[in-house]
């Protein structure tokens, strides 16, 4: 997946992806299309004609919508849907949350507007048990895009879970830090070997884990999340140098 639709993607990555017919989703925020450093609609339509390319919706404004009211969120997304229909003749079934930030209310709006899948920016691997409106992705960019990291990421496997609490990933001042609990499926092996790290207190550190039973853990956060996004990454090493990986992202309310 590629977010934003920058012209640098069209100039550098598109020729390689096209030559090798590598399938991908390009998420575009409709307000920026055709402006400086962004692809135009002619280029987007060129990609859309290929059967291995999907064009996804990335909102209209790409603002911090999760902090806005329901009406503001809905108006922004509806505007992008109208532009999609005008330019491409349809609205995409794929959505990418701006900055990977979402709340239960944001998810509800996306479902009501007819989307089938929504992507965040919390790290992890897709599998059939995931919530289709909280699909994980590993960021690959100029800051997190070196080859060594990429080689690690392509050796990750899903860490399957039944549930993560709290369901609400949008934190207020009163529930930060959150009480984080994960319930795994019975076929997940070596839960006792799991390691989790978080950026609580704005410093990445290893988190303490309370093993409630063989399927349930509590990730203990001793300090509040300070940065705008609170992150937890958990992994279990498996044979062959692979890792089972689970990422959780929280959004910290401005007020």
Predicted regions and their residues:
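Substrate-binding cleft of extracellular glycoside hydrolase catalytic domains
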Residues: 1, 5
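Metal-dependent polysaccharide deacetylase catalytic core of the NodB/CE4 family, i.e.
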Residues: 6-106, 116, 129-139
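Terminal accessory/targeting
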Residues: 7-11, 15-42, 140-255
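Acidic, His- and aromatic-enriched active-site or binding-groove loops in soluble protein domains
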Residues: 115-124
């Amino acid at each position: 997946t590629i977010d934003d639709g920058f012209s640098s993607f069209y100039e550098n990555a598109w020729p390689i992806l096209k030559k090798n017919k590598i399938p991908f989703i390009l998420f575009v925020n409709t307000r920026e299309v055709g402006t400086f450093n962004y692809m135009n609609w002619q280029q987007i339509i060129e990609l859309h004609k290929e059967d291995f390319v999907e064009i996804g919706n990335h909102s209209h404004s790409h603002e911090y919508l999760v902090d806005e009211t329901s009406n503001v969120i809905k108006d922004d997304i509806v505007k992008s849907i109208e532009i999609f229909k005008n330019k491409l003749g349809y609205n995409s079934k794929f959505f990418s949350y701006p900055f990977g930030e979402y709340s239960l209310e944001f998810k509800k709006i996306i479902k009501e507007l007819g989307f089938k899948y929504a992507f965040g920016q919390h790290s992890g691997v897709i599998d059939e048990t995931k919530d289709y409106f909280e699909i994980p992705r590993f960021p690959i960019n100029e800051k997190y895009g070196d080859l060594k990291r990429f080689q690690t990421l392509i050796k990750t496997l899903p860490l399957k879970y039944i549930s993560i609490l709290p369901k609400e990933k949008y934190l207020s001042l009163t529930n930060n830090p959150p009480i984080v609990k994960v319930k795994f499926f019975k076929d997940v092996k070596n839960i006792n070997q799991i390691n989790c790290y978080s950026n609580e207190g704005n410093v990445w550190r290893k988190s303490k884990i309370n093993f409630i039973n063989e399927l349930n853990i509590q990730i203990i956060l001793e300090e509040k999340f300070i940065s705008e996004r609170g992150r937890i990454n958990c992994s279990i090493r498996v044979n062959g140098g692979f890792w089972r990986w689970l990422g959780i992202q929280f959004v910290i309310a401005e007020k």
